[in-house]
C-alpha cells in the first residue's frame, strides 16, 4: 500500500492506496477492470472510476484540477494497465446471480478438482468466460457453506444462473480466476508452463520449446493432456478427475522435469 496525502486548499485527506493487484479487494478489482476499459473512452468516467478505486471523497476529488488527477492516476494506478494480475486469494468468493448467491473456489484453487479445472481453464483459454464462471461459481451447500460438487450434467443449469451477471462482473471474475491460477499454478510449475523468453529454471538457462510437453493451446484445451496422462490407467480416471487440480498439475510438472533430466543424462 502507498500512503497518499491529498491537500486541496485548507482541506486534507489521507488514504491508503493499493499499488499492486494483490492489494485490491473484490470491489476494487471490479473497478480496476472497468478502469482498463475506459482508457480509450471518457476521461471523466475514467477519473471517477479512479476516485472510487483509491476511495477519495467526492468533495476532496472535486477540488483537484483535472490535469493533476490524470497525473495522479498515471502514477498510482499504472500497475492496473501494465502489470499482469497475480495473487493467491480469491478476491470475489461469492457473487449474487438473480435471487441466488453463488460460491466460488477457495484461495489458491485448493478445492478445485482436476475435472473442474479441465472444464474451467479450457473455457478460459477459448475466451468463453461465462461458461468458465458457470463451472467455478456454484450454489453452496446450506449445511457446510461449501460449493456443491462439480458435475458436468449441471453445466446448462449453472450457465442459466450465471446469465444474470453483467459483462463487467463476468470480466472481473475471469480476471480473478486467471490471477489466482497464475500465482497458484503457473508460477509454481515452470516446466509445464515454459517461458516465452530466455529464463532460468532450476539454475539452468532454458528457452520455450514447442517439442516439449506444455500447457494446452487455446484450441486443444486440457482434455488432450488428460487423455495422454491416462494412457493405460483409464481404470483410475475417476480417481484422477476427483483429485485436486493443483496436485495433478504439480505431478505433470514433475514428470516433465524428470524427463528432461533423463535426456540430459543420456546426452
What role is predicted for each listed range?
Residues 1-267:
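An amphipathic, hydrophobic-aromatic interaction surface with interspersed Lys/Arg
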Amino acid at each position: 500500500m502507498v500512503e497518499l496525502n491529498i491537500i486541496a486548499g485548507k482541506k486534507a485527506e489521507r488514504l491508503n492506496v493499493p499499488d499492486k493487484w494483490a492489494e485490491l479487494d473484490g470491489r476494487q478489482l471490479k473497478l480496476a477492470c472497468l478502469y482498463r476499459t475506459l482508457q480509450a473512452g471518457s476521461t471523466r468516467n475514467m477519473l471517477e472510476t479512479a476516485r472510487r478505486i483509491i476511495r477519495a471523497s467526492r468533495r476532496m476529488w472535486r477540488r483537484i484540477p483535472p490535469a493533476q488527477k490524470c497525473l495522479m492516476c498515471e502514477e498510482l494506478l499504472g500497475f492496473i494497465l501494465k502489470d499482469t494480475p497475480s495473487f493467491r486469494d480469491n478476491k470475489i468468493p461469492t457473487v449474487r446471480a438473480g435471487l441466488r448467491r453463488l460460491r466460488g473456489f477457495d484461495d489458491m484453487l485448493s478445492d478445485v478438482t482436476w475435472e473442474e479445472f479441465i472444464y474451467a481453464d479450457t473455457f478460459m483459454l477459448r475466451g468463453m468466460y461465462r461458461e468458465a464462471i458457470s463451472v467455478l461459481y456454484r450454489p453452496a451447500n446450506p449445511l457446510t457453506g461449501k460449493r456443491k460438487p462439480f458435475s458436468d450434467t449441471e453445466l446448462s443449469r449453472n450457465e442459466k444462473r450465471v446469465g444474470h451477471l453483467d459483462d463487467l462482473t463476468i470480466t472481473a471474475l475471469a480476471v480473478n480466476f486467471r490471477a489466482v491460477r497464475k500465482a497458484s499454478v503457473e508460477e509454481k510449475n515452470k516446466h509445464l508452463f515454459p517461458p516465452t523468453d530466455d529464463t532460468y529454471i532450476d539454475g539452468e538457462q532454458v528457452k520455450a520449446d514447442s517439442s516439449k510437453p506444455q500447457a494446452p493451446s487455446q484450441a486443444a484445451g486440457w482434455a488432450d493432456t488428460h487423455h495422454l496422462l491416462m494412457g493405460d490407467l483409464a481404470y483410475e480416471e475417476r480417481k484422477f478427475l476427483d483429485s485436486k487440480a493443483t496436485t495433478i498439475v504439480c505431478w505433470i510438472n514433475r514428470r516433465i522435469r524428470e524427463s528432461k533430466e533423463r535426456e540430459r543424462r543420456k546426452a
